[in-house]
A protein has these predicted regions:
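Auxiliary, metal-adjacent structural segments of Zn-dependent hydrolase domains
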Residues: 2-61, 70-71, 98
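Short pre-active-site segment immediately N-terminal to the catalytic Zn-binding motif
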Residues: 60-82, 131-134
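Active-site-adjacent bridging/hinge elements
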Residues: 54-63, 112-124, 147
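Post-HEXXH active-site segment of zinc metalloproteases
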Residues: 71-79, 91-125
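Flexible glycine/proline-enriched surface loops and loop-helix/loop-strand junctions
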Residues: 124-132, 154
Length: 171
């Protein structure tokens, strides 16, 4: 198909991610490639972006067949990239090996649950992608926290001022 990350809304979203990382003083830039879905392989400092986001016709087809497109608009695309940048940042700096990271987020070696029961009233985790996803696993907790922290014009200091999750944002 000749698709690359230089097509669709992807280049603008990646440029924005670069700007957000630079504004926070982070020199790391995740490697990005097209794949069948969003993911950041464990131990790899990069982000897989769904191929259907590289062309508007494929995006429309995905919406028609699946009834949704994760990252299908620029706002959602940026939010998901921030989240996956957190996943990529972790292995780039070997964060999960640090004792203080484990004390704040938990052990990354804990197996992912087959399913999880979210606690909507919990204030121990940030809210970013929805469905209280940060509660599902320590690495998701970090990725969601990183995304909230990275978002430009975020009011997280006020939003989470009285929450135990603030400790994670200050990490």
């Amino acid at each position: 198909l000749g698709l690359t990350t230089a097509h669709g809304q992807i280049p603008a979203a990646l440029a924005r991610l670069d700007d957000e990382l630079a504004r926070r003083g982070i020199r790391f830039r995740p490697h990005c490639w097209l794949s069948e879905d969003w993911f950041s392989p464990d131990g790899v400092p990069g982000i897989a972006i769904p191929f259907y986001l590289a062309h508007p016709r494929l995006t429309r087809l995905e919406r028609r067949m699946m009834h949704e497109v994760e990252g299908g608009n620029l706002r959602c695309l940026r939010r998901t990239l921030r989240h996956d940048a957190g996943h990529a940042f972790d292995p780039a700096h070997r964060l999960r090996r640090r004792k203080n990271w484990r004390e704040v987020f938990g052990a990354a070696s804990v197996p992912y649950p087959v399913s999880y029961v979210p606690r909507p009233g919990s204030r121990r985790h940030v809210l970013h992608l929805g469905h209280w996803y940060a509660q599902s696993h320590p690495t998701e907790d970090f990725a969601e926290t990183f995304a909230v922290w990275l978002a430009p014009n975020s009011t997280w200091r006020n939003d989470y001022a009285d929450w135990p999750a603030l400790r994670k944002l200050l990490y």
